[in-house]
Regions:
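Basic, polyanion-binding surface patches
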Residues: 1-161
Length: 161
């Protein structure tokens, strides 16, 4: 049976940083969800062929970052190149910040950064569902619009209160 996964859209877009040793990358994702309040758990689905999949598997940590609507072009660029061949921070004008607990960097331009340690992973076909325990949070006081994906590279912003 086939289904059109776009029926599940719109979805909020996030950026996820990962690192193993000195290698780091950023991936744009719309497949993510909160899983638990206590402990605070977040799930992200990452394609098994992605460089970020390798980094998360090896490093066992990631940072989930919430971009603003005005970051749409940067999010598109991040999602269009492999971090295996390019440093996405410098290539796309994003500022890495040292995290408090984990090795992958925060993204300065994002509204929220959630530092996560991999608590579990689930084989999910051509993706892996990484369950991250949130070990530190960073939030901006700005009220910029959140970025959502309608599927097919169509984006829009939603105001937050």
């Amino acid at each position: 049976m086939e289904y059109d996964y776009k029926l599940l859209y719109p979805r909020q877009v996030v950026l996820v940083t990962s690192q193993s040793g000195e290698k780091r990358s950023i991936i744009a994702l719309a497949w993510h969800c909160p899983l638990s309040f206590k402990p605070p758990l977040i799930g992200i689905a990452v394609g098994k062929t992605r460089f970020s999949h390798y980094l998360i598997t090896e490093g066992r940590e990631f940072v989930l970052s919430i971009p603003t609507e005005n970051m749409e072009s940067k999010v598109m660029s991040v999602g269009s190149r492999s971090g295996k061949d390019v440093d996405k921070f410098s290539a796309f004008g994003l500022t890495p910040l040292k995290a408090d607990v984990v090795k992958p960097p925060l993204i300065k331009e994002c509204l929220i950064n959630l530092e996560c340690r991999v608590a579990a992973e689930l084989d999910a076909g051509d993706h892996t569902l990484f369950v991250g325990e949130v070990v530190a949070t960073h939030a901006s006081a700005t009220k910029d619009k959140l970025l959502f994906d309608m599927g097919g590279r169509n984006f829009f912003g939603i105001a937050r209160e």
